[in-house]
């Protein structure tokens, strides 16, 4: 009875995406394994475990190691490359669609200008259409009076923040400046005398605002012609 020696050749395991596996004798290169699978590459299972889809495929001349598992996967199909000739052919069509060529700076300036225009229109309409206050009906006139912040603060302190009293004082200041009643000295009394007359009065709106402050409307009457 003689002695016998058994040599067991080591194999590598290859697995497909659908789960099918087959073993291949080593040594063998990746090119030999993928010869029957055009468009496929081999991925090391350990590399896939650590790097996932970012794992690098085996080089065609790289040798498979025994007792290791490899994945046989298909390379993703890339979109066709655009040649210089194709690019030149598309440029005239893009020129026709765009009409006018503008640079990046010009496009940015146009965008900022359009946004500013929309903002100005929105601000102008938010107060009643003309940007100076609420819309007035027929027979009304809107007059805008600006006073220094210090003067408005002084009026508020003197009248204990009474809005009606402050409005009367500001109305008197306006009439003194405009000189429309009593030679510019009619003051508040001129408004009261007009209110008691039989002639139909026409209401007039005077709005005042401190520098940077909120604009407040004040109504007063004068005789109409």
UniProtKB/Swiss-Prot annotation:
Organism field: Arabidopsis thaliana
Domain of life (superkingdom): Eukaryota
Pfam assignment, any one: PADRE
Protein name: Uncharacterized protein At1g66480
GO biological process terms, semicolon-separated: response to fungus
């Amino acid at each position: 009875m003689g002695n016998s020696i058994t040599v067991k050749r080591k194999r590598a395991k290859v697995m497909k995406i659908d789960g099918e596996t087959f073993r291949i004798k080593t040594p063998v290169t990746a090119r030999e394994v993928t010869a029957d699978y055009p468009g496929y590459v081999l991925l090391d299972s350990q590399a896939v475990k650590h790097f996932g889809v970012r794992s690098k495929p085996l080089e065609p001349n790289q040798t498979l190691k025994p007792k290791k598992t490899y994945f046989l996967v298909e390379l993703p199909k890339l979109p066709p490359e655009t040649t210089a000739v194709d690019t030149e052919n598309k440029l005239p069509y893009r020129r026709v669609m765009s009409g006018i060529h503008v640079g990046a700076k010009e496009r940015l300036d146009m965008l900022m200008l359009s946004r500013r225009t929309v903002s100005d229109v929105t601000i102008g309409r938010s107060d009643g259409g003309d940007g100076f206050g609420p819309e007035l009906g027929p027979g009304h006139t809107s007059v805008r009076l600006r006073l220094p912040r210090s003067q408005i603060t002084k009026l508020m302190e003197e009248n204990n923040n009474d809005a009606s009293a402050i409005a009367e004082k500001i109305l008197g200041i306006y009439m003194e400046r405009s000189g429309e009643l009593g030679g510019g000295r009619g003051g508040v009394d001129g408004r009261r005398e007009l209110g008691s007359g039989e002639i139909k009065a026409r209401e007039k709106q005077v709005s005042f605002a401190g520098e940077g402050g909120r604009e407040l409307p004040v109504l007063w009457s004068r005789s109409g012609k």
